[in-house]
């Protein structure tokens, strides 16, 4: 298989070059969309109990077959001994070490549905552990490994055939409440947690610890098994859930942390009265405390992520980082229970941090122009996953005391070494309200300041997502620069990582300061002699797509081309057709029919569809019909308006993609269409 050949190539070079995954001989190539689609993708990882070996998953996209295969690998933490331990036509997920360090548990769809499997650490003696009807979506063994918690989807609500059994071939859905759709699916199932004995042979069923409750755990669409935690004694399970349905669910972000006792079968809420989004519970190793991530306000999904710790004996809850103005993510207790490690993004760089609970002292462990995306700690050994604008995900060994990082893997070294390096600059720009805005400027390969280049303004989605050092297989800033463009990527008002005041400014101000920030970034870069001011485009997805539609009606000839992916064209239509109403209420300010709602009416007044009369610049719309967050009719309306206005326009519509573009051939079609459009209008 191709992946096997690639694995052998990678294994031959990692041992000697693990410290510098981008080092090697540059052959002067540039990254094309076709070459980009051959890059492998590192995903889940786990550190062995002795801290010496990592197991991790890698997916290999195949454009020809239009699918990706996922395999598992092990590697020593010095970068040596990399080995592919699975090689099947199925896909393997979520590898986890068993306590003896000799076996690895994982999920595989080898039998058709996703089930729990186990094998030796060298890949031998592969054995299926579960045969759960419909498959599982996640698993977590108890500390003594005698029990396993698994999650699976259960039926939710009544379907048409339940109401009319004689109409078993009818396809219509009878809807009676909100949240009938979510993200990219009709809500006919919800995930529930089950526990089962793991020592009695094949697992075919389990006890639903939320039996009879019509609520999600984990919470869709983002949460997974990380929202569960076993107590060290194996007697309790902590989990996060938003125990609401229908309209109440659509209006509220209020979730809570629950602890289920296996002996009594009782559940109690340890975050009762905390009205925001509570998630990611983790018992301390000594079993005395539990930590979790908490937002303060109901209905605000981008509120500050705070770190809370509760004393399990007294129930006392403590906000342990009250002066920390950055989001806390992916917490893990220190082995001695005296501190907690976490990820936090500060000024568009995501690094590893540690808080000492007794003193409240917070220490930044790692530094640098990159994003850490995951980590695991065993004793004094830390394994982390990291990427940047320039390099995709790889694994690194991090010294938790001084932050020194050594590369463990170099999955795409054979390809990356052939490419001409690119440069990424960090610039601070003064905004029109007197603020300071960090803007990334990504330069093309072989950049020559004496030449003129076309440029692209990258508009971020979210809207409250930092333009950090991300690596995306859709919106990839390196890929844009590799096509000969200067990429301008501002952290405009309304993104985290620069204090909560900066982050919150965008709420109720969609067409306001953040749009002026985009224009500021473009105007500042146009002062550079190497930027061709007549050949600048603006691109973006989701809120970035909204930004593009808005800029199309307000840019005063700054731009020569636009691309909007999954963007909002009509804010009133968006309010009436989206599913998570808490988001629309907080960000927009409320429904459009509240004529005396000043904030809402101000927001609706900035809706891009109200300024189509100003459209005069070529624009490409891209959208997926399975996008239930922002319906594809938004792109259709924008395209029709552009066509009727006589504005050069195209639309790429996917019947089988959601808010993202996930299938390999569709992804390559996205890139070819994207760059074809930009080249057509910006490289004349």
Swiss-Prot record:
Localization terms from the record: Periplasm
pH dependence: Optimum pH is 6.7, using Lys-Ala-MCA as substrate.
Main location: periplasm
Domain of life of the native organism: Bacteria
Family indicated by similarity: Belongs to the peptidase S9C family.
Residues making up the signal peptide according to the UniProt record: 1-24
Repeat as UniProt keyword: yes
Gene for this chain: dpp5
EC supergroup of this enzyme: hydrolase
EC number assigned by the record: 3.4.14.-
Function (record text): Catalyzes the removal of dipeptides from the N-terminus of oligopeptides. Prefers Ala and hydrophobic residues except Pro at the P1 position, and has no preference for P2 residues. Shows high dipeptidyl peptidase activity toward the synthetic substrates Lys-Ala-, Gly-Phe-, Met-Leu-, and Ser-Tyr-methylcoumaryl-7-amide (MCA), and slowly hydrolyzes Val-Tyr-MCA. Is likely involved in amino acid metabolism and bacterial growth of asaccharolytic P.gingivalis, that utilizes amino acids from extracellular proteinaceous nutrients as energy and carbon sources.
Protein name: Dipeptidyl-peptidase 5
Catalytic residues in the record: 542, 627, 659
Listed Pfam families: PD40, Peptidase_S9
Quaternary structure (record): Homodimer.
WD repeats: 87-127, 220-259, 323-363
GO molecular function: aminopeptidase activity; dipeptidyl-peptidase activity; peptide binding; protein homodimerization activity; serine-type endopeptidase activity
Keywords: Aminopeptidase, Hydrolase, Periplasm, Protease, Repeat, Serine protease, Signal, WD repeat
GO annotation, biological process: peptide catabolic process; proteolysis
Signal is among the record's keywords: yes
InterPro entries: 6-blade_b-propeller_TolB-like (IPR011042), AB_hydrolase_fold (IPR029058), PD40 (IPR011659), Peptidase_S9_cat (IPR001375)
Organism: Porphyromonas gingivalis (strain ATCC 33277 / DSM 20709 / CIP 103683 / JCM 12257 / NCTC 11834 / 2561)
A GO CC term assigned to this protein in UniProt: periplasmic space
């Amino acid at each position: 298989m191709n992946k096997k050949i690639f694995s052998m190539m990678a294994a031959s070079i990692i041992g000697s070059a693990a410290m510098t995954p981008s080092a090697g001989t540059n052959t002067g190539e540039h990254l094309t969309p076709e070459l980009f689609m051959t890059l492998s993708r590192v995903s889940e990882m786990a550190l062995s109990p002795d801290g010496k070996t990592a197991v991790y998953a890698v997916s290999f996209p195949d454009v020809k077959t239009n699918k990706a295969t996922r395999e598992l690998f092990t590697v020593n933490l010095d970068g040596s001994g990399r080995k592919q331990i699975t090689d099947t036509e199925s896909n393997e997920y979520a590898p986890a070490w068993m306590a003896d360090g000799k076996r690895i548990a994982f999920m595989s769809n080898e039998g058709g549905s996703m089930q729990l499997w186990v094998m030796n650490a060298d890949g031998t003696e592969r054995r299926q552990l579960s045969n759960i009807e419909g498959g599982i979506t996640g698993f977590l063994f108890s500390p003594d490994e005698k029990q396993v918690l698994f999650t699976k989807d259960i039926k939710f609500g009544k379907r048409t055939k339940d109401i009319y059994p004689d109409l078993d071939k009818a396809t219509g859905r009878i809807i009676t409440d909100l949240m009938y759709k979510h993200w990219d699916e009709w809500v006919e199932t919800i995930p529930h947690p089950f526990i089962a004995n793991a020592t009695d042979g094949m697992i075919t069923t389990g006890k639903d610890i939320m039996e009879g409750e019509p609520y999600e755990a984990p919470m869709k669409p983002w949460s997974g098994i990380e929202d569960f935690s076993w107590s060290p004694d194996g007697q309790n399970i902590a989990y996060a859930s938003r125990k609401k349905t229908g309209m109440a669910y659509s209006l509220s972000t209020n979730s809570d942390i629950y602890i289920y006792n296996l002996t009594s079968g009782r559940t109690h809420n340890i975050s009762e009265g905390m009205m925001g989004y509570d998630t990611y519970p983790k018992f301390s190793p000594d079993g005395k405390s539990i930590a979790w991530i908490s937002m303060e306000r109901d209905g605000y999904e981008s509120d500050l992520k705070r770190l809370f710790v509760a004393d399990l004996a007294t129930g006392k809850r403590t906000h342990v980082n009250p002066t920390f103005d950055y989001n806390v993510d992916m917490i893990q207790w220190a082995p001695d229970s005296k501190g907690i490690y976490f990820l936090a993004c500060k000024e568009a760089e995501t690094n590893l941090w540690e808080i000492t609970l007794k003193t409240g002292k917070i220490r930044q462990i790692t530094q640098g122009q990159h994003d850490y995306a995951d980590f695991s700690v065993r004793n004094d050994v830390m394994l982390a996953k990291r990427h940047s604008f320039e390099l995709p995900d790889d694994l690194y060994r991090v010294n938790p005391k001084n932050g020194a990082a050594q590369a463990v893997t170099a999955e795409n070294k054979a390809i990356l070494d052939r490419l001409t390096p690119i440069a990424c600059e960090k610039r601070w720009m003064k905004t029109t309200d007197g603020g300071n805005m960090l803007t990334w400027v990504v330069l093309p390969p072989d950049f020559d300041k004496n030449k003129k280049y076309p440029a692209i303004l990258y508009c971020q989605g979210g809207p409250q997502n930092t333009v950090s050092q991300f690596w995306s297989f859709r919106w990839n800033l390196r890929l844009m620069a590799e096509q000969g463009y200067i990429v301008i990527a501002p952290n405009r008002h309304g993104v985290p990582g620069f204090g909560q005041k900066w982050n919150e400014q965008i709420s109720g101000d969609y067409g306001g300061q953040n749009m002026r920030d985009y224009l500021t970034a473009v105007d500042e870069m146009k002062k550079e002699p190497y930027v061709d001011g007549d050949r600048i485009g603006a691109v973006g997805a989701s809120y970035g797509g909204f930004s593009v539609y808005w800029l199309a009606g307000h840019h005063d000839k700054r731009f020569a081309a636009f691309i909007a992916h999954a963007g909002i064209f009509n804010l009133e239509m968006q309010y009436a057709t989206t599913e998570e109403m808490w988001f629309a209420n907080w960000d927009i300010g409320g429904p459009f029919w509240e004529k005396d709602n000043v904030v809402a009416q101000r927001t609706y007044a900035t809706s891009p569809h109200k300024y189509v009369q100003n459209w005069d610049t070529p624009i490409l719309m891209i959208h997926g019909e399975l996008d239930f967050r922002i319906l594809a009719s938004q792109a259709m309306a924008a395209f029709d308006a552009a066509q009727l206005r006589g504005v050069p326009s195209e639309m790429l519509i996917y019947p089988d993609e959601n808010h993202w573009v996930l299938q390999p051939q569709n992804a390559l079609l996205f890139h070819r269409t994207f760059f074809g459009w930009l080249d057509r209008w910006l490289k004349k």
